[in-house]
Amino acid sequence: IKQNVWSYSWITVQSVKQPKISSVMLKAFIVGEMDGISEELPFDELDEYLPRFPLDLRVKYFSSTKGKLSFPEGFTPKQVKFMLHYAQKPSEIYETNFEWSYGV
């Protein structure tokens, strides 16, 4: 991978006692800094092949997503942020953050 381009993958898991096919709406962001200013960049603006957000995932047990991100010059990633909700419950938003890491 060339400089400022990163491979990524994530797995969305449905953890319920009796899984059924569900529609999950997902948004993902890279939180970081550019020129000393905090920025939150959506994955769909950094990966030209990723559909526009929110992603509508069909999940029974799990769903896998992968691609390549291209960061703007001078951007330093700090965290990855995910926000999702079931399509039938848009007001119940689940959010989680992970520290940025590479080489894992």
Can you annotate each of these PLM segments?
Residues 1-104:
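Membrane-proximal structural modules of membrane-associated proteins and complexes
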